[in-house]
Amino acid sequence: MNIILLGPPGAGKGTQASKLVADRGMVQLSTGDMLRAAVKAGTPIGLKAKAVMEAGELVSDEIVSGLIGEKLDSMAASEGAIFDGYPRTEAQAHSLDEILASRGRVLDHVIELEVDEDALVERITGRYTCANCGEGYHDRFKQPKVAGVCDVCGSAEFKRRPDDNEETVRTRMAEYRAKTAPILPVYEARGLVRRVDGMADMADVSAAIAAILDN
């Protein structure tokens, strides 16, 4: 089972991918993480990517495709892949088909976590964490049981991410739409796209994804 998981920042894509990794033994292929790991490990593709990045240039499709291929080659045939952040262009979508086919794999589903932009803004701008233990809270959905005191460690210090503001969230939504717009029609034409309500309860989102994969 090989899937592409799509969703704007804050839609819970990372949470759902982690659950698929834990529950089904799938492997998450996040191009950003893979790029950093390849550079750190000094693999041939990593060295090539490092030279490109140090020159201030964008990493080419060829390098990204090489990373994907390298990762798939290290996986057991029984392990499914979750593609995160790739493909982003029609050319990359076709390249992924070739990469999978050459390894006896196919793309089974493209799952998009749909969100309401205004509700997503509220979800993201209201979140904060304990500065000591990292426990997560929300202005509306999850307040500490005792105001100003962390439920887990008792700390009175909390912090918010500086980019959890409305302007940044809306900019990211626009960027997400611009990046996914080219590839969704490609997969819709092939009947691969399934949409899930990303604003639902986390467990309900997980159940909806599981139903798609088990169908």
Swiss-Prot record:
Q: What is this protein called?
A: Adenylate kinase
Q: Where does AMP bind?
A: 31, 36, 57-59, 85-88, 92, 160, 172
Which pathway, metabolic or otherwise, does it act in? Purine metabolism; AMP biosynthesis via salvage pathway; AMP from ADP: step 1/1
The record's SUPFAM superfamilies line, in alphabetical order, gives: Microbial and mitochondrial ADK, insert 'zinc finger' domain, P-loop containing nucleoside triphosphate hydrolases
NCBIfam families, per this entry?
adk, PRK00279.1-2, PRK00279.1-3, PRK14527.1, PRK14532.1
User: Function of this protein?
Assistant: Catalyzes the reversible transfer of the terminal phosphate group between ATP and AMP. Plays an important role in cellular energy homeostasis and in adenine nucleotide metabolism.
Q: How does it assemble?
A: Monomer.
TM ranges: none
List the EC numbers from the record: 2.7.4.3
Q: Which CDD domains does the UniProt entry name for this protein?
A: ADK
PROSITE patterns to which the protein is assigned, alphabetical: ADENYLATE_KINASE (PS00113)
Q: Name one GO molecular function term.
A: ATP binding
Name the GO cellular-component terms: cytoplasm
* InterPro entries tied to this protein: Adenyl_kin_sub, Adenylat/UMP-CMP_kin, Adenylat_kinase_CS, Adenylate_kinase_lid-dom, ADK_active_lid_dom_sf, P-loop_NTPase
Which biological process, per GO, is one annotated for this protein?
Answer: AMP salvage
Residue span of region LID: 126-163
Q: Give the residues the record marks as binding ATP.
A: 10-15, 127, 200
Compartmental location: Cytoplasm
